[in-house]
From Swiss-Prot:
Pathway: Cell wall biogenesis; peptidoglycan biosynthesis. It comes from Actinobacillus pleuropneumoniae serotype 7 (strain AP76). This is Glutamate racemase. Its EC number is 5.1.1.3. It is an enzyme of class 5 (isomerase). The active site is at C73 (proton donor/acceptor), C184 (proton donor/acceptor). The keyword Magnesium does not apply. It catalyses: L-glutamate = D-glutamate. One of its GO terms (molecular function) is glutamate racemase activity. Substrate binds at D9, S10, Y41, S42, N74, T75, T185, H186. Provides the (R)-glutamate required for cell wall biosynthesis.
Length: 267
C-alpha cells in the first residue's frame, strides 16, 4: 500500500504533522504545499481560506491522483473542511486544537491555548472548549508573531528569544497553568524554547500523533484506487521569491525530491 497524501499549510509548520504521519506510514507517497503567497493564514478572511483550499487541492489532484488530503493548519481547518468535503470524494483530515486531551491530562484544570488569532477567535474553538473543557479554565493567547518566529527558525536555525518571551509573558507568572495546547502546527517546532520559558507547565500538547493515527485508520477503511508506486515526494509553493532555493534545500532535508511552483492562476 502506497497511498498518495497531500498536506498543505500557509507555511512550513505543517511539516510537524507530515513528520508524525511519516513515522506511522513511512512508505506513503507525500506531497506538501505551502501557500506562501497567502502567508500567514491568520491574517486572511474565511472566504479567501476556502478559495485557496479548493484551488490548491483541485490543481494538485489534476496532476496527482490523491488518496487523502490533510489540512495541516489549525487556522484553515476551522473554516475549510466542509467546502473540501463537499467538493472532493477522498477523505479530508483537519487539524484542530487538542482541547479534549488537554482537559483530560491537566491536573490543575487550567489550560493555555496558544494559537493564531484566527483560531482563538473562531466559534468552532469555543464549541470545542464548551464540549470538552467545561470544567477547566482556558487561557488564550492569539499570536501571529510566533508563526513568523518559527518560519525564521526553519530558515535560519535561530529563534529571537526576546520576541518569543514577549508572546507568552502573561503565562510566565501564572500560578496554576500546567498544560499548554500548541494550537498551530508551527508551534511544536519551538516546543523546547517554550518549555524553557514556561518551566511550571508540565504538559505541552500537539495534535501530530492523533492525526497520524486518524490518517492510518481512514486509509485502512478506504479502497486505494490511486496507490502510487515509486513516486517521488514533491513539495509545492504558490509564490516564487528570493527564498525559493533556500526553501527547496529545507524541503529536501525533510525528504522531498524537489520544490515546484504551483501556479494557481493557470487553468
Amino acid at each position: 500500500m502506497k497511498p498518495t497524501i497531500l498536506l498543505y499549510d500557509s507555511g512550513m509548520g505543517g511539516l510537524t504533522i507530515y513528520d508524525a504521519i511519516r513515522q506511522t506510514l513511512p512508505n506513503a507517497h507525500y506531497l506538501y504545499c505551502f501557500d506562501n503567497a497567502y502567508f500567514p493564514y491568520s491574517e486572511r478572511s474565511e472566504n479567501v481560506l476556502i478559495e485557496q483550499a479548493v484551488k490548491i487541492v483541485q490543481k494538485i489532484a489534476e496532476k496527482y491522483p490523491l488518496d487523502m488530503v490533510v489540512v495541516a493548519c489549525n487556522t484553515a481547518s476551522t473554516v475549510v473542511l466542509p467546502a473540501l468535503r463537499e467538493k472532493f470524494a477522498f477523505p479530508i483530515v483537519g487539524t484542530v486544537p487538542a482541547i479534549k486531551p488537554a482537559a483530560a491530562i491537566s491536573q490543575t484544570k487550567t489550560i493555555g491555548l496558544l494559537a493564531t488569532k484566527g483560531t482563538v477567535e473562531r466559534p468552532y474553538v469555543a464549541e470545542l472548549i464548551e464540549k470538552y473543557a467545561k470544567d477547566c479554565i482556558v487561557e488564550k493567547i492569539g499570536t501571529t508573531t510566533l508563526v513568523e518566529l518559527v518560519e525564521e527558525k526553519i530558515r535560519t536555525g535561530n529563534v529571537d528569544q526576546d520576541r518569543l518571551s514577549k508572546v507568552v509573558a502573561e503565562w510566565q507568572t501564572h500560578p496554576t497553568l500546567d498544560t499548554v495546547i500548541l494550537g498551530c502546527t508551527h508551534f511544536p517546532l519551538v516546543k523546547q524554547e517554550l518549555q524553557q520559558l514556561l518551566p511550571k507547565v508540565k504538559f505541552f500538547i500537539d495534535p501530530g500523533n492523533g492525526i497520524a493515527n486518524r490518517v492510518a485508520t481512514l486509509l485502512s477503511e478506504f479502497s486505494l484506487e490511486n496507490s502510487a508506486q515509486n513516486k517521488e515526494n514533491i513539495a509545492f509553493c504558490t509564490k516564487m521569491d528570493e527564498e525559493f532555493s533556500k526553501r527547496e534545500i529545507i524541503m529536501q532535508q525533510w525528504g522531498f525530491k524537489r520544490l515546484e511552483l504551483l501556479n494557481l492562476s493557470q487553468k
